[in-house]
Each structure stands twice: as C-alpha cells, then as structure tokens.
Amino acid sequence: MRFPSPLIEGRLVRRYKRFLADVALADGTLVTAHCANPGAMLGLNAEGFRVLLSPSTNPARKLGFSWELVEAELPGGPQWVGINTARPNALVAEAFRENKLAPLAGYETLRAEVAYGKASRVDFLASGGGLPPCHVEVKNCHLMRQAGLAEFPDCKAARSARHMEELAGVVAAGGRAMLIVVIQMRADAFDVARDIDPAFDRALRAALAAGVEAYAYTCAVGPEGVEIAEPVQILTSPASPAGSGTS
C-alpha cells in the first residue's frame, strides 16, 4: 500500500484525548493531526519522536493531517512503525489480491464487514474456489518490549477477546475461522501481552484449542508506504484440555 501523496515529516509534541496529536513540522508550524489509534501506544508516543503525517484531500475535514508512522526507539534499535489502525484491513485485502496470504490460497473473494456472532461483524469472509467459507479477524500490532518480539494488545481489549470467542463459535458450528495479526514493523515472533490483558490471552488460547487458526505477518514500513512482508512464528500456545494439570 503506497501512500497516495508524500508524507509530511514532523516531531511529536504530544498525543492526547486518544485521537489527537500535536506535531511540530520542520518549518516550526504546530499542527494537530488525527491519531487513528485507540490503544495505549506504549513506546510510540514519546515527545520528540520523528513522525510522518498524511495530508487530507478533503477540504471540509476539521483536521488536515493523519498520523501514519513514527520512528520509535524500540528494543533492538529504532525503526519506522505504522500506528494507523485503519490500515491493517486494507493491507490484508491488498495481500489477498496479490496472492501473498498462503492461508487464504484458493479463495476467490474476500468480503468485508460481514455480520456474524452476537451482533458482531467479522473483518472479512473468504469464499469461493470450492473451499469452505472462512471468517477472518484482523488485529493490528505495534507493541515491542523485547527485541524482535511483537505483542498484542497494548491495553485491555475486551472487544478483541469477544471476537476470539465468536471465531471459536464458528469452528464449533463446523466452519473455518482465523486470526491474522498485522505487525506494522519488523519483528521475529509474536506473542500475547498476557500481563496487559490476561482475559484476551485466555480467549485466544481457548480459540486456538477450539480449532481457530492464527497467523502473524510483519510489514515493510517506510515513508513511501506499508505492505505485508512475511509470516512470523506465534508463540502463544492453545489452552490445555480441562483437567490436564498444565497451563
């Protein structure tokens, strides 16, 4: 996914009210950008970090910029990280069209926002090609507290835990369901940040034990664009059967 116009560089002054960020541009102008990220953004929102903003083409929009990337000082060294949580679904759709997602090989269509479960909408429903329909939930990941290890979530994620339960319900009913974690940075492996949200950890492990598939992909991130790069290992283990005495 290439950005449609060149990004604007600045330095982060502060991120506040979850969805707002003040940025000092190179010429000294202070602008307020939309921050499309409801999470804690641990390690990504320090004052002075270099950031890149996409300019809005809508003259009626209140905020003229959206925060896209941050050059964060992460364990293992600095790197560009995508912080816009609206991007991962588009990245998955693009990778599907380009046949870059092996777990979805053979499917012909990928429909977005399909109703299922308890008044929920799954991110995608893959169908066609003589294959059973597959419910696909996408999660954005940009937390790194150990070199090479990407983690999710970076705050309590009750809605995401519910999504895992509903995917497990799809499998229990005889269907196919999967989680795709889009890591908007370089990483070597993925795991759940269970110390941040043990409830999501339990929900994912139960879903894996029920037969839900899970895949994690890193991204190539830079000023020109973001694209899904390669799969990495998921370290989270399925929940053990009840009464097994293991965790």
UniProtKB/Swiss-Prot annotation:
* GO molecular function terms listed in the Swiss-Prot or TrEMBL record: DNA binding
- What InterPro entries does the annotation carry? SfsA (IPR005224), SfsA_C (IPR040452), SfsA_N (IPR041465)
Q: What's this protein's family per the entry?
A: Belongs to the SfsA family.
* PANTHER family recorded: SUGAR FERMENTATION STIMULATION PROTEIN A
Q: Name one Pfam family in it.
A: SfsA_N
Q: Which NCBIfam families match?
A: sfsA
Gene designation per UniProt: sfsA
| Protein name listed in UniProt | Sugar fermentation stimulation protein homolog
Q: Where are the transmembrane segments?
A: none
Q: Which domain of life is it from?
A: Bacteria
